[in-house]
Amino acid sequence: MKLFDAHQSATATILLGGSLAVALAAAPLGAYHLLTKYDLGAAPGGKEYWDYITFDSSSRRLYVSHNTEVKVVEADTGKIVGSIADLKRVHGIALVSHLEKGFISDGGADEVVVFDMKSLKVSGHIKTGGNPDCIIYDPASKHVFTMNGKSNDSSVIDPATDSVVATISMGGRPEYAVADGKGMIYDNIEDKNEVVSLDSRTNTIKSRWSIAPAEEATAVDMDMKHRRLFIGGRNKLLAIMDADTGKVIQTFPIGSGVDTNIFEPGTDLIFTATREGTLHIFHEDAPDRFSIVETVKTEFGARNAALDRKTHRVFIDTADFGPTPEPTTEQPHPQPTPISGTFRLLVYGR
């Protein structure tokens, strides 16, 4: 997953900052709308960028990547209850609840940082491949997998011993991954326009499938019951794939800069968040038939999200942005810069 910072290409206008837990007017019944905002303050060092959000249903906490730290936020109140700080460049957070351990992919340090889920204190550092990005826990193998965007491989970690037990060549730049809970992991290979299936018990690649007509695969999630993958392409397409055959069943147009897809089993809804400021909501009518429910206008930059299955609320983070600079010879395609101190969580629900 690409971090959101000054290196992202887009056109933005300055949005006025959101205050803590601002209640907003109700939308029509049944439609997703903005319920509140949680102000999360400035990033350490003043440079705003962010990546994955992880929701822990047992503690009802959100783990939010923010520059060189992970902020831990109460999902119901927006209160910041702690942080894991002094990191280099945070990407993702994987939780191994039965061990009460969390694992942070620190891309700037080429390592995974281990912390205690209760005390939030760091307990270890694990060297990985270059720029660990996505990080997930696979319950079938009981291992943690990092997808390393610089070295094009995956580091396999035993969370009981905090050690790397295998390294898997991915054959391209790995992005978002999802585990099916039965021993298969599906990972987007962004620069190859592919999805690979990986046997998590043998640490071997089993299949490589094209995501065409989608390109630059980033976000992915899965309907495990019906074996469907939801793949976000940076060419503004959502591709729905059969996880057993690699067949692309259906596609939908989406906004630019997708970075999160979420499937909710209880409602059969698919949520797709994009950088341009759209939350697309689709429905699985049948395993081979999907439909558009609605497209919710969010805010520019709001492309990293998490879902609370209990309340059906979606949490998306973003910030305000300055104006786009004038093009120069050195920077022919300049990008707007996030404004320090405006980072926030947007909470959407019905």
List PLM regions with ranges.
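N-terminal secretory signal peptides that target proteins for export/translocation
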Residues: 1-8
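Alpha-helix initiation/capping motif
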Residues: 2, 20, 240-242
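Bacterial N-terminal signal peptides
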Residues: 11-23
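Predominantly soluble domains enriched in secretory-pathway, periplasmic, or organellar proteins
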Residues: 25-350
